[in-house]
Every structure is written in structure tokens, then in C-alpha cells.
């Protein structure tokens, strides 16, 4: 019974609605996990290459591809290099971190047993992360000092003077509703009373 129901459904699709389905398939964009909603970033070329609607083999007639179709085809077959580079960078960073952990924590006799003699001193295993931590703190202090000392205008600057002719922005408190946290039972009671 389900097989005949399924076959009649397919026949219905192949009938008059076939053109409409093709139009929908060509105009919609596959954008997980927000089905039916626009993506926040443009779709990557990898999604368009995974879900091709056009055949990759030429037609039997051997007709030339129109210029607009050729541009669409060039976009569809573009290699998604950003995804590949990101995955390779992930693998390389994990491999580098693993090598660093092995180098820092494995005892020297074990490394010599595996004929690994050319490695840096263990002092660098602590020195490099410590230097990086101090560098981050230094950058934080320098950026704050730069923002307050260089980018902030002095008090004697004309841009800091406020008088009766200055156009100072005023906040309209009445336009914004007061934000109050209510108990969940009160919110539910209010919603149920409205319905």
C-alpha cells in the first residue's frame, strides 16, 4: 500500500509540478542548520559543489555553453580552498602541540632510546610559553597606555569643551522600557490570563 502511495506521489511530482520543483531547487540555498532562513555569511563554494543540480557531462548535441552558464559553472567548480587550508592548519597545529608535549614531558632516556638526540634544551619548554604570556600582558598594558595617552584628547583641547552651544546627545529614558526580571510563575500567570 505504501509502495503504490509512494509511486502515485512520484507521478504527481513528475506531472505539472515538475517545473515548479526545479525552480524551487534552483532558487533555494542549502543552509544548515537554519533551514529556510538566510545564512549569516555567504555560502561557501564547497556547499555549491557538493549539491550540484547540473550534470558534469556534456549533452549529446554538443551545443556550446552560454556565457552566463559558463560563469555559473566556473563558480560551481571552484575549489573550496579556505576549508582545506583551515583543516590542514588544524591538523598541523594539533601535530605541533603533540610534538611539543612529547618533547616537554618525555624523559631524556626515553628519547635517547628512540634515537632522538637532536632536540632543544628542556629550558625552552618553559621559557617560550612564559615569554608568550609576558608578551600578552605587555601588549595589553601598551594598548591601554596608547589609548589613554595618545588617542585621548588633552583637557585643553577645543574638542573637549562643552558649553551652551554644544550639541550633547540626550538619552530619552521614557522611550526605553524598564527591564525587570520577573518570576517565571508570574510570567506564565500573565500569559494565561491574556488568553
Curated annotation (Swiss-Prot):
It is a multi-pass membrane protein. Its main location: endoplasmic reticulum. Residues 1-84, 144-195 are cytoplasmic. GO terms for biological process: GPI anchor biosynthetic process; meiotic cell cycle. It comes from the Eukaryota. InterPro entries: GPI_Anchor_Biosynth, PIG-P. The keyword tRNA-binding does not apply. This is Meiotically up-regulated gene 84 protein. It comes from Schizosaccharomyces pombe (strain 972 / ATCC 24843) (Fission yeast). The gene is mug84.
